[in-house]
Amino acid sequence: MYIFQADQLSAKDTYKLLSGTVIPRPIAFVTTLSSGGAVNAAPFSFYNVVSSDPPLLSISVNRTEGRQKDTARNAVENGEFVVHVSDEAIIEDINETAASLRPDESELTRTSLHPVESKAVSVPGIKEARVRFECKLERHITFDNDQGITTADLLIGRVVCFHLDEKVYDAEKGYILTDELKPASRLAGNHYAKLGEEFTLIRPS
C-alpha cells in the first residue's frame, strides 16, 4: 500500500488523489448574477447535501491564485444562487460553461441553455434543467493553505424553493425517479459517469 503524508504532497498531487478517489461526485450547475446583471453559470463537483432540516447544500469553489471565481463572488455579494442537477441531456452544455470568461460575460452564450425566472430569488435558473434549487446564502467560509493563501470558498445555501420536472417526480409517493433524471457525475480529469446498476440493502434496526 502506498502511504503519503499530506504535507509532503504538492497541491496538484493532492487534487489528483482526492478527485480520483472521492467518486462519483454529483455536479452542481450553479447560476449567479454579476453586479452588472450578467447571468454567470458554472459546474462544481465539490458539492453535496449538508442537511435536510434545514435544507442545506454545500458547494466548494476553488480559487485561482487566490482570486475568487465569479460564482463565489456573486453569491457572497448578492446572497443568492440557483443550483441545478446536472443530467445526461445537458451535461455537454454544462461543460461549456467551465470556460474562463470575463465577469460581465455570461457563460450561457456558449450553450443552447436558456435562463428562466426564479420564484423566490432574483437569480435566474436554467429552463432545460429538470431539477433546480433556489438558494439563499446561509454561510460563507474561506479556507487557507499552509502558506496562508486563501484557496477555497465554501458556500452553504439554504434551499428556499424546489423545482422538479413532472417526469422525474412521483407526486403520489414523493419520490425522485432516478431512471428518468439520469444524473451525470464527475470522476477524475475529463472523465464523467452515468448512473450505473442500482442495488438495495435493508438498513439494520
From Swiss-Prot:
InterPro entries: Flavin_Rdtase-like_dom, Split_barrel_FMN-bd. Its cofactor is FMN. Keywords: Flavoprotein, FMN. One of its GO terms (molecular function) is oxidoreductase activity, acting on the CH-NH group of donors, NAD or NADP as acceptor. The keyword Flavoprotein applies. It comes from the Bacteria. SUPFAM superfamilies: FMN-binding split barrel. Belongs to the flavoredoxin family. This is Uncharacterized protein YwrF. It comes from Bacillus subtilis (strain 168).
